[in-house]
Design a protein with these regions (language model features):
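Beta-propeller folds
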Residues: 1-351
Length: 351
């Protein structure tokens, strides 16, 4: 009889346990990717069977072929208590819904060709993890910092949300989209411990510093002026390199139907494609998607958990209606001697 009661209780508790554990996936490794020569692998994992906050881990073997797992980046260490109460941009929420992603913290990442640099977002902030090796033991080392945080804070309307960041294969740049603009981040030098970089004074204008004083030379290159002890290190810099109209024909941003650098609804929901731009292997070219949803019907969706919130309109195709008009464009990028973005040298529509 006791065994029967145990089975009955287990069946009754199954829906709750399934929900609390994200279908029994919490605490299990996922999103694994081999890096470098294939002897190491990155993966995501939370700390327990009901912990939703996933961290970035590294799987590796030492010289005696013993296996190890090292945590590289922990959202709770980077953000503290706010890692458990996410503030996710609307477009990112939509992507996660289509990908059936219910986790928090680091839910996706992008790694360069050598497997030395990894980028990801937490709570809409952009982070970089660098992976190294201990010279004495050969064990992996890591350090993590936020990328271009001053830029995001200076003009959030321009530079956010940070969606779908992808690091270049050469590890020198990060590309992300706001939905309206493709943003390219020049990765600066790593600050000395206890000496965070400061963005030089001056107003931001589409990724270029202006109205700076004479001592702040070469700001368009992201440099500080020369001092007695030599050049100061390069800082992070964000530039909008391509965009679509942020307003409709009547000047109303709420009704704008164009997006750039994102996958249209059908691609995510039916094709499991969530990327809307791609780096070339040599990091010199970018292929990106832009699309117009003007011909798709609008659906108004309410949030049962927040009945005081007004229903939001979203354009979704349905049977016998039009899909979005999708376009592909390839651009060629130019960089200076410091690997800083210097402009677009060519572009072509390919579809």
């Amino acid at each position: 009889m006791s065994e029967t009661n145990d089975v009955t209780d287990a069946i009754a508790n199954l829906p709750r346990r399934r929900a609390r554990t994200l279908r029994f996936t919490c605490g299990a490794p996922r999103s694994a990717q081999t890096i470098g020569n294939g002897s190491r692998a990155l993966f995501l994992r939370s700390d327990g069977p009901e912990d939703l906050v996933t961290a970035l881990w590294l799987s590796w073997f030492d010289d005696s072929s013993e296996h190890h797992e090292t945590k590289l980046a922990d959202p709770r260490e980077l953000l503290g208590a706010t890692a458990d109460s996410e503030n996710v941009p609307t477009e990112e929420k939509a992507r996660r819904e289509r990908a059936r992603e219910g986790g928090a913290g680091i839910v996706s990442y992008s790694v360069d060709a050598d497997g030395d640099r990894v980028v990801f977002t937490i709570n809409g902030r952009l982070f970089l993890t660098e992976i190294g090796n201990d010279a004495a033991t050969g064990a992996p080392t890591s350090r993590t910092r936020e990328l271009a945080g001053e830029w995001l804070d200076e003009d959030p309307a321009m530079y956010t949300p940070v969606l779908n960041p992808r690091i270049a294969p050469d590890g020198e740049h990060v590309l992300y989209t706001t939905g309206t603009y493709l943003m390219l981040v020049d990765i600066g030098d790593w600050p000395a411990e206890g000496e965070p970089f400061e963005v030089p004074e001056g107003e931001l204008d589409n990724g270029v510093e202006v109205e700076a004083d004479a001592e702040e030379s070469a700001l368009s290159e992201g440099l500080y002026g020369d001092e007695e002890d030599g050049d100061q290190p390069l800082t992070d810099r964000i530039t909008a390199i391509y965009g679509v109209s942020a307003e409709d024909e009547d000047g109303n941003p709420a009704d704008n139907t164009w997006k750039i650098g994102l996958a249209e609804f059908v691609a995510g929901e039916e094709m499991d494609r969530y990327d809307g731009f791609w780096w070339s292997p040599d990091s010199q070219h970018v292929l990106f998607e832009s699309f117009d949803t003007a011909d798709e019907p609008t659906w108004y969706i309410s949030d049962p958990a927040n009945p005081e919130t007004a229903a939001t309109g979203r354009r979704y195709p349905r049977a016998l209606t039009r899909n979005a008009d999708v376009y592909l464009t390839v651009i060629s990028l130019a960089f200076d001697e410091n690997y800083r973005y210097a402009g677009i040298t060519g572009n072509a529509d390919v579809a």
